[in-house]
């Protein structure tokens, strides 16, 4: 009986890790490509937070999750452009610039997102079931 509990707990932890770790996995893959190009981007977390708040805000106000996604891509691109400007043009250290962007994104997303906490829901993207993977419990 006790073994079944631990197996169930392990399965639940792995399932939760896969579910909640997908966004971090995407950021990790992006950072791997950036590292291969010789860029150390420590500010990915701030960029992701700003993109998430922007996507939610735009999707809620426009009623379209696709426009929210495009806005998040634009904000992420602007923050990446700011990182490139600081490191290439101003010759700032990549770690310092990345940490500044991480702190900026974290703080600014908290300030912008505070009024959105009371908002119930925003439009969602449609589901795209993958034939083999969608049948896995």
Which residues are covered by each model-predicted region?
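Transmembrane helix-bundle core of multi-pass membrane transporters
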Residues: 106-137
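Alpha-helical transmembrane segments within multi-pass membrane transporters and channels
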Residues: 63-108
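Short helix-capping/hinge motifs at transmembrane helix termini and TM-loop junctions
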Residues: 35, 63, 91, 113-117
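Short, non-helical or kinked segments that cap or interrupt transmembrane helices
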Residues: 32-51, 88-101
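Alpha-helical transmembrane segments of multipass membrane proteins
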Residues: 28-33, 53-58, 81-85
């Amino acid at each position: 009986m006790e073994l079944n509990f631990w197996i169930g707990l392990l399965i639940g932890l792995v399932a939760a890790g896969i579910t909640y770790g997908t966004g971090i996995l995407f950021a990790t893959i992006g950072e791997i490509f950036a590292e291969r190009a010789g860029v150390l981007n420590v500010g990915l977390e701030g960029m992701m937070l700003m993109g998430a708040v922007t996507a939610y805000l735009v999707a809620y106000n426009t009623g379209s999750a696709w426009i929210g996604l495009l806005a998040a891509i634009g904000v992420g691109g602007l923050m990446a452009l700011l990182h490139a400007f600081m490191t290439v043009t101003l010759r700032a250290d990549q770690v310092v610039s990345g940490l500044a962007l991480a702190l900026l994104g974290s703080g600014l997303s908290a300030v912008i997102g505070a009024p959105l906490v009371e908002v119930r829901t925003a439009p969602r993207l449609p589901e795209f079931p993958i034939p083999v993977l969608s049948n896995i419990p």
